[in-house]
Design a protein with these regions (language model features):
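Structured mid-to-C-terminal alpha-helical surface segments
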Residues: 1-50, 60-68, 72, 76-290
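Glycine-rich beta-strand-to-loop/alpha-helix junction loops that act as flexible
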Residues: 52-56
Length: 290
């Protein structure tokens, strides 16, 4: 008997999942390749050096019900940020063999480019190619440095698209720090902010998760101290002018359409939740730091 073609089997199972869920096949494929990349990180010797953050972390919380995203973002700690060294690390990670998932990664043609996270932190974006049966899929991963995570990172079980595939357990950001970083971006960019996903994600986390206010403030303080946040007496973020701006309202509607969000969700409602929960925290922070 010849060697089993796991890739072909997975393709069929993903087609069945598409029919069951209504999600587009290419989206499920991208999610599957991300999952199998994360599996290789999780079984590598570098498991504790890469903390999952961003859209893939939010997906880990809510599975296919989360905001559709195919981003993979890590914060690296206790590891060199030298790009040549990181390339060798990723070659090793991508070279891990897992016959059962049908995926292989091209370890010989990894490219990279420098990135800057929130104007301050140098990071690296890696580009590489994944293969499964006849499918060739281009991928990228962002690696950032220098942020603080409060409370300390915990391990999570990443949701699997298909049963009977090797499971994924890896280190991840705290949700409090996810909110803190997104809130920092809102305050920093203020009226020039077009990142609707940050407003959406903060709203979802603040309304769907039970987060302790004291712990959330600790995360906000740690992030603001680390990223530096200057007092802004002319802040527009919490004003009616900001919320009702016609361009921003249109950006919000286009964003919801882009992510195929079916429920009614106005930007005014989102901003009311963010204002009620987070405005007192930045006021407390500024009061204690002026």
């Amino acid at each position: 008997m010849g060697k089993k073609n796991y890739g072909k089997s997975v393709k069929t199972r993903l087609l069945n999942l598409m029919n069951e869920t209504g999600y587009k096949y290419m989206y499920l494929l991208a999610r599957y390749f991300n999952e199998r990349l994360l599996y290789r990180v999780s079984v590598s010797q570098y498991k504790d050096n890469f903390l999952l953050k961003g859209g893939s972390l939010l997906y880990a919380m809510d599975g296919l019900n989360a905001r559709p995203t195919i981003d993979v973002d890590f914060m690296a700690e206790r590891i060199s940020r030298d790009r040549e060294f990181l390339t060798k690390v990723f070659q090793e990670i991508l070279g891990i063999v897992c016959d059962e998932d049908g995926v292989t990664f091209d370890t010989e043609n990894i490219t990279m480019e420098p990135i800057t996270v929130e104007k301050k932190y140098p990071g690296t974006r890696f580009f590489f190619t994944a293969h499964m049966d006849s499918i060739i899929h281009k991928m990228s991963v962002d690696i950032g440095f220098g942020d603080v995570v409060t409370p300390y990172p915990a391990s999570i079980d990443f949701p699997l698209l298909l049963p009977n595939i090797p499971s994924v357990n890896l280190q991840a950001y705290s949700l409090e720090t996810v909110i803190a970083e997104k809130f920092h971006t809102m305050l920093d960019r203020d009226e020039y902010n077009s990142r609707m996903k940050d407003f959406f994600d903060c709203y979802q986390l603040l309304t769907k998760r039970e987060l302790d206010d004291e712990t959330l403030y600790d995360a906000i303080k740690a992030t603001f101290d680390n990223r530096e946040l200057e007092y802004n007496p002319k802040l527009k973020l919490f004003t009616a002018e900001f919320v009702n701006d016609a361009n921003r309202q249109m950006q919000w509607k286009l964003f919801l359409r882009k992510i195929q969000w079916k429920e009614e969700l106005s930007f005014n409602v989102v901003m009311q939740v963010i204002t009620d929960r987070l405005k007192p925290m930045v006021e407390k922070y500024w009061k204690n730091n002026l």
